[in-house]
């Protein structure tokens, strides 16, 4: 059975990879252990968040699916950090996790060029260092020139609840043990990571009346630029708190916690610790927040965000019932920790293709990341690049100044990770340029060029770009004088008067200036769409800082654009230390800029490398 691209794993990375490949016209096969669980939210029933919302918007701008599906099945929408600057705001949605699965599965089953087979991949087939296909537990062999592995926590997965251990990729689902062995046989180095999840509670056993209520935004904002007429049904979340009794119950059972007994060897996520880890590390705190989140529109089960645990079941019940509002709580699904194998991501190119095996791509948690959004972003890029490679085209490699996706992948392949990696706005050097609301302007052109965004959507994006350019030119070039009429106009807008000529941009840049005021400032803005208005306001208010960051990038542009030829002989360069040569050979950076990001590569080494690349180009 022959295909062009095979995707192994039907989680968030696998969905984006298989959809991108199929939508780019490639005959694609998705192999997954359980078809009903395609798109399952293994942990929290939410998409987005700080920095993660940026990733979802970027996935959408490139023509990916996560944002569209979230808008269709979301049950609460909020913008986090709304009072702060636009660079650090993050969109987040609670999703109906059941409907999310059904939506994604139906979408995949109805996508042309895409087939699904419920099997367990056991062996990755290759010949002379090139991928040839995949073998499954049913002894079926599927041939393909490109294979994308998106196994999540299923790669040699091991679940822990107290002293009990269970080989599984998720509760009730088999793990993929043989695939780990196959990856090792291909010469890849594997490590071990750990994550966990919390108990799910029967809603009718929770006393919501004494919990703090947290509603969604009054005017919810859609994730996808392509979502129209957005008016979701929203449910509230709630906030509860642990207390000293809870903490004492947990402390007295540390000897039963796999995290502390040595039973768990994998390293867990630093920024999403289990409740027992929190109590151990932050013993001085008298309480911890718990966010009580509905799992579906029917709200029959609630997810206890902040209560991830692998303590024994009876201890989970005891510590849960010590929390106010949960005195009579009943657990529907217990919390657990899970260990799984991952591939050290420094063995990847920026295209997410492995360096050792041509045609083999990895995406998602197998690369050491944590989070649906990080997985989806990698899956999309792997699917795109596998399809481009089949057409003998250059891979799409997003720079750090272009996208959070670029930051994510560059961090993984140049620095690696020894713990589950999650995205933060602080990881992006140029975050003022990488805002959520301008993702479509940054990346929409790529999505359209790849055939993943249609002409109508692209024309809308270009219209916003045109409105932004013309709006900024008008505001920067138009002076407002302190005439009587202008002072009256400012007063009518509830704005401070001026005493000298200033550009309209200076007025719009004021913190108090809103889109409503801009529409009244000049007739050209009256009928502009909200997306264009948002762009104009943000660019005006942060014009100085945006300009500074663009200047920094411009100075580095020469270095960013200089490509390092594949199989470049670094050892032939005199003046490079053995340490520098070894690191360049190990990471194989595609550009000078990528080389400069590698720890231990000095500016002097970059200058020498630049000279030798130019010399080799002249010789060629």
UniProtKB/Swiss-Prot annotation:
Its cofactor is FAD. One of its GO terms (cellular component) is cytosol. PROSITE patterns: GIDA_1, GIDA_2. It comes from the Bacteria. GO terms for biological process: tRNA methylation; tRNA wobble uridine modification. GO terms for molecular function: flavin adenine dinucleotide binding. Keywords: Cytoplasm, FAD, Flavoprotein, NAD, tRNA processing. The keyword DNA-binding does not apply. NAD(+) binds at residues 268-282. SMART domains: GIDA_assoc_3. FAD binds at residues 9-14. InterPro entries: FAD/NAD-bd_sf (IPR036188), GIDA_C_N (IPR049312), MnmG (IPR004416), MnmG-rel (IPR002218), MnmG-rel_CS (IPR020595), MnmG_C (IPR026904), MnmG_C_subdom (IPR047001), MnmG_C_subdom_sf (IPR044920). It is found in: Cytoplasm. Its main location: cytoplasm. NAD-binding protein involved in the addition of a carboxymethylaminomethyl (cmnm) group at the wobble position (U34) of certain tRNAs, forming tRNA-cmnm(5)s(2)U34. Homodimer. Heterotetramer of two MnmE and two MnmG subunits. Belongs to the MnmG family. This is tRNA uridine 5-carboxymethylaminomethyl modification enzyme MnmG. It comes from Campylobacter concisus (strain 13826). The gene is mnmG.
């Amino acid at each position: 059975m022959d295909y062009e691209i095979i995707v192994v794993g039907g989680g968030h990375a696998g969905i984006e990879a298989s959809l991108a490949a199929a939508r780019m016209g490639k005959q694609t096969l998705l192999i997954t252990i359980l078809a009903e669980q395609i798109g399952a939210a293994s942990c929290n029933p939410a998409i987005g968040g700080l920095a993660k919302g940026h990733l979802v918007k970027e996935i959408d701008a490139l023509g990916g699916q996560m944002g569209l599906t979230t808008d269709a099945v979301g049950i609460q929408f909020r913008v986090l950090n709304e009072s702060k600057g636009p660079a650090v705001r993050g969109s987040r949605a609670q999703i109906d996790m059941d409907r999310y699965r059904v939506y994604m599965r139906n979408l995949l089953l109805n996508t042309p060029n895409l087939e699904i087979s419920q099997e367990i991949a056991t062996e990755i087939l290759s010949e002379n260092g090139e991928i040839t296909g995949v073998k499954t537990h049913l002894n079926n062999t599927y041939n393909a020139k490109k294979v994308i592995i998106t196994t999540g926590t299923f790669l040699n997965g091991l679940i822990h609840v107290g002293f009990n251990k269970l080989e599984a990729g998720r509760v009730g689902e088999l793990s993929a043990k043989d695939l780990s062995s196959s990856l090792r046989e291909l010469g890849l180095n594997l490590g071990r990571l750990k994550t966990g999840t919390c108990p799910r509670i029967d809603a009718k056993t929770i006393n919501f009346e004494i919990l703090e209520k947290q509603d969604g935004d009054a005017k919810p904002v859609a994730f996808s630029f392509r979502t129209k007429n957005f008016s979701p049904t929203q449910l509230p979340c709630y906030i509860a708190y642990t207390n000293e009794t809870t903490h004492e119950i947990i402390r007295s059972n540390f000897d039963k916690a796999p995290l502390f007994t040595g039973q768990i060897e994998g390293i867990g996520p630093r920024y999403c610790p289990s409740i027992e880890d929190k109590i151990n590390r932050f013993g001085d705190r008298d309480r911890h927040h718990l966010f009580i989140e509905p799992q579906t529109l029917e709200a029959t089960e609630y997810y206890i965000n902040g209560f991830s645990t692998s303590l024994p079941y009876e201890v989970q019940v005891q510590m849960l019932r010590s929390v106010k509002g949960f005195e009579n709580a009943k657990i529907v699904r217990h919390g657990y920790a899970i260990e799984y194998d991952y591939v050290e991501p420094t063995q990847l190119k920026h295209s997410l293709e492995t360096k050792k095996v041509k045609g083999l791509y990895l995406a998602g948690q197998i690369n050491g990341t944590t989070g649906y959004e990080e997985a989806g972003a990698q899956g999309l890029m792997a699917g795109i690049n596998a399809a481009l490679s089949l057409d003998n085209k250059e891979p799409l490699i997003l720079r750090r100044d272009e996208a959070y996706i670029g930051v994510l992948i560059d961090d993984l392949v140049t620095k690696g990770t020894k713990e589950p990696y999650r995205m933060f706005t602080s990881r992006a050097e140029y975050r003022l340029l990488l805002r959520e609301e301008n993702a479509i302007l940054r990346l929409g052109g790529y999505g359209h060029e790849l055939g993943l965004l249609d002409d109508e959507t692209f024309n809308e994006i270009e219209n916003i770009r045109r409105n932004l350019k013309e709006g900024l030119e008008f505001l920067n070039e138009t002076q407002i004088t302190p005439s009587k009429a202008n002072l009256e106009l400012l007063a009518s807008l509830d704005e401070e008067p001026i005493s000298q000529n200033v550009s309209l941009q200076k007025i719009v840049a004021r913190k108090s200036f809103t889109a409503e005021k801009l529409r009244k400032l000049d007739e050209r803005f009256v009928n502009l769409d909200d997306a264009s208005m948002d762009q104009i306001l943000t660019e005006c208010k942060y014009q100085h800082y945006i300009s500074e960051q663009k200047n920094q990038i411009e100075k580095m542009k020469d270095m960013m654009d200089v490509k390092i030829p594949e199989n470049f002989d670094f050892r032939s360069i005199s003046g490079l230390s053995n340490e520098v040569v070894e690191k360049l050979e190990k990471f194989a950076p595609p550009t000078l800029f990528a080389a400069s990001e590698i720890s231990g590569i000095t500016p002097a080494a970059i200058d020498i490398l630049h000279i030798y690349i130019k010399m080799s180009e002249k010789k060629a």
